[in-house]
Amino acid sequence: MSEQLIQAVNKQVANWTVMYVKLHNYHWYVKGKDFFTLHEKFEELYNETATYIDDLAERLLALNGKPIATMKESLETASVKEAAGNETAEQMVQSVYDDFTVIAEELKNGMDLADEVGDETTGDMLLAIHQNIEKHNWMLKAYLG
């Protein structure tokens, strides 16, 4: 198995681990007229994120990789950053949109690496995540106007 592919998948474990905590922060601290809508949306997203973390980590183990499993490693490795803690509702949505945009590009890179080594299973897993976040980003962009 390609070490580059293992690193790319591990980066996604780190990204989604940071997103999981960030989305909880947003779920708990969102305020304003869109509270009910965003509170539910952030919960939906962190539940989905939990599935990604587990699926990606287990795939790494199946490939004899070692998934990142601490917040310290996740924060050091991830392309996305944790929540600042004082965002407005609109800033929260913009941040998730921006993070998903970064992750989508990295997923494409991972799909290319999987294709190069003939790992259809990993490629399909990354594609499924990519499809989901593209749909979420369409909705988040519509919310932002």
Swiss-Prot record:
Any keyword Mitochondrion? no
| One Pfam family matching this protein | Ferritin
The residue ranges crossing the membrane are none
Recite the UniProt keywords alphabetically. Answer: Stress response
Spell out the CDD domains in the cross-references: DPS (cd01043)
Q: Which SUPFAM superfamilies match?
A: Ferritin-like
Q: Which GO terms describe its molecular function?
A: ferric iron binding; oxidoreductase activity, acting on metal ions
In the induction comment, the record states: By heat shock, salt stress, oxidative stress, glucose limitation and oxygen limitation.
Q: Which InterPro entries match?
A: DPS_DNA-bd (IPR002177), DPS_DNA-bd_CS (IPR023188), Ferritin-like (IPR012347), Ferritin-like_SF (IPR009078), Ferritin_DPS_dom (IPR008331)
PANTHER family named among the record's database cross-references: GENERAL STRESS PROTEIN 20U (PTHR42932:SF1)
Q: Which family does it belong to?
A: Belongs to the Dps family.
Name of this protein: General stress protein 20U
Give the species.
Bacillus subtilis (strain 168)
Cite the source lineage: Bacteria, Bacillati, Bacillota, Bacilli, Bacillales
Q: Encoded by which gene?
A: dps
